[in-house]
Structure formats: C-alpha cells, structure tokens
Amino acid sequence: MNLEPQLFIGDASDAEARVYATLPRAGLADDAQLIGELIGPHCRYSKTLPARIRFVDRGPGPTLLAEAVVPDPCFWTPELPFMYSVELRLAGAVAAENEIAPAPPAMRRPFGIRRLGVHGTSIYLDAKRFVLRGVHLDAPKIEDLKAAREAASALYIEEPSEAFLQEASEEGVLLVVRLGEMGAQGKLAMELARLGRWPAVAIAVLNDEVPAGKEIRLSARSMLLAQRLNSGAATPPASIAPWAHVLWWEIGPTESAIVQPPHMPVVAYRPTAEPAAIAQRRRNCDHLQADLAPLGDFAGYFT
C-alpha cells in the first residue's frame, strides 16, 4: 500500500494559493486524516520570513484530502525559486485485515508553488506567456546547473536523480525530462509522480506510442505532458494523444516542413553533436528561432 500523499496546487493568485494533499482512502481506518503544515518560503536568491500554514481536513470523500491556504504566496520561478517544506502525517490508523496497524511515520519534503499551464499555442509560467529555451545534456551533472542558470537555459535530460531534481529546484533551472520505455502504465504513473514533486520539472516528454488515456494526467498534475514526434511526422488532430498538453517536435538540421497544429503549443528541438558550452548552445536557440520564423511562433526552442 502506497501511503505517501500526493501534493497539488489548486486555485492560485497573488492574494492566495490553495495547496492540497491527497491519499486514497482504501485500506485506511474510518477516522484517518492527513494533518500537517506547509512551512516557508525560503530561497537562495531572496530573503524571506517563513510562515507555518496548517493543512485542514476537507471531510468525507473517496480520498483523504487536506488543504492549506497560503496567503501572499511566493511562487516558484527560475528567477526566484521559492521553496516551501511540507510536513504531513496520517492521523488515525491503517486498517490491516483484522487488526488496526499504527500510522506510518510523518512525511517531510520540499515543495514549490508554481503556476504553469498552456493557453492556445503558448506556454504560460507565473501567469505570463513564456517561451522555453534550453539545451540537451546526455549526462547532466549537478555542476551544470550553475551554468544553466547563468545562461537562462532550461535543460532537456533523461533519468535525473533525486539529488539533481532537488538542486535544480533550489537553483531555479527548468527541466524537460524525456521518459524512455516505461512498460506497464503503473510504472509510468509512478515516474510521473516522482518527477512531479519538483517544481523544476516543467515538461515530461513521452513517446507518441504511449497507450495512455487522458487519466494519466492525474499522475502529473503539476507539470505538462509533451508528445514526442520525430522529424517529418505528420500531425493530423487524430494523431495527437489525449493526454498531450504540448507537442515536442524533433527536427532535422534543415527541417522546413513542420505543420504547427493551431490549437496547442509546439516546442522545436534540433539535436546537435556540437560539444559547446551551455551558454553557446543556449545562444543557438535564438538561431533556431530565426530559422523557424517563417513557420510561425513556437512555444519553445531547444538544441
């Protein structure tokens, strides 16, 4: 039984943000509740006065649900990556067949309140249109994050460790994570839930053949899901997966036949073997944008 609550953000404005913790009720005692606090914020690049906001149980339902209402929230952005700490525990007990087992130990983990979404053909970050620009790294190291921040570059990576995800979140570096073959859908959901704990993860890129319905978004409430399309792929509306928020288009060095769907964001990625520094490769994103300008505006550019 997985007894780790899932955190997600509800309504969020400059005045207040609502943070929720949820856990399936199956197998729990009737009086079980999630209780705890949201503590913070803290930020490497700004001084703050931390507060403690209590999680309040929201009553009966198919899941346990607790809510923390954060006044004057400090949102996570690459410029100011504000982080909070969540402390939660399961009050009551776990029903174990014919007896009642003690509740599991308290959970404490970092959390960022980030506003990220799509509208039309654009990505929005912190309620503003945001064009994502970044570089691909085959074997990213934690030391790369400083260079990425200095270059205002996102990173496109695979299989990041928990330590890398935490450092990127503290440093303010946006990540696009490509997921390989996950096999069973349950494994995919677990990996999306792991990535979704960190505000640095903006997009998870899934293969276009992933046999998932729109419900897979429930495992990725805090990030965007991108459908990966190869160079030259046709994209009639019927070929777009129901779970996709974004299309991730891998293009060749002289690609010119991209047809941008009118109703959703497209991020263009041009792979390169150039062993340049992150700052130089980040500047290449501007060249890619210029090359693709006759085709229209894209939601992001990666090299």
Regions found by a protein language model. Give the residues of each.
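Secreted/periplasmic carbohydrate-active enzymes, especially glycoside hydrolases
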Residues: 1-303
